Amino acid sequence: MKKPGIPSDRDAFGHQVWAYFKDHGSPAEIVERDDGFVSFSENTAWYFGDVRRWSASERQAIRLARGHRALDVGCGAGRVALHLQERGFDVTAIDNSPLVVKTAKARGVRDARLLPFERITQLEPDTFDTVVMFGNNFGLFGSRARARRLLKHLHRITRNNALLIAQSLDPHQTNEPAHLTYQRRNHRRGRLPGQIRIRIRFHEFVGPWFDYLLVSQAEMSAIVNGTGWDVDRFLTEDGPRYVALIRRV
């Protein structure tokens, strides 16, 4: 049987996070889009930051986490899970990167699992009171259709009045010609403008291609509508990033 998650030799993001954890260096993050656009940043430390280093909207949103059981989707190095554990939550943290999960466990996340997002159907129904998708991880839904399907799965594994706290980035807030051209191409293909296909590179490791979904607030509201969830409000800051508070109905 095929193991879940990304094979080690293609786990570029996992190797990046593990290298930072072991060496306390600052390895660069390289993201390649399928049109050839490449972005470069040295923000790996961000995946390890405690709550004092989070954005204002993240800090405001996480204070609203409710209940006792929480699910951290795309947990990375465990910054969200560790914070919620400190507050007394029973946290399940999931990621599709073996080395990311190894890092999260090494940092003290008690229940970190190698579980791709699309396999959340394996989790017990009526379990979680809060679901967190920080780090622009609304993007892990990948596409409009996949988002609606997975939101319904999230509904099944959450309890009454559960709260989904999800961060995204409005792709329309850009003047970058390459991004605007990409969005027009998406429109011609019947995709949302912010549905991008990317892969991660780190040293000799090249990750698999995957779809990542960036949406405006209006686009998010339309996606969520009719899935058993409803956007309660948005927490915004200067710039394109925002956090949505989405309630189970």
Report residues per predicted region.
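Conserved SAM-binding strand-loop segment of SAM-dependent methyltransferases
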Residues: 108-119
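Conserved class I S-adenosyl-L-methionine
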Residues: 68-76
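Conserved SAM/SAH-binding beta-strand->alpha-helix loop
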Residues: 97-98
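N-terminal auxiliary segments of SAM/dcSAM-dependent transferases
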Residues: 1-31
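A short glycine-rich, Lys/Arg-flanked "PGG" loop and its adjoining helix->strand segment in the class I
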Residues: 147-160
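SAM-dependent methyltransferase
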Residues: 17-19, 159-221, 225
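Conserved alpha-helix/loop element of class I SAM-dependent methyltransferases that forms part
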Residues: 51-68
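A short SAM/SAH-binding and catalytic strip from SAM-dependent methyltransferases
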Residues: 128-148
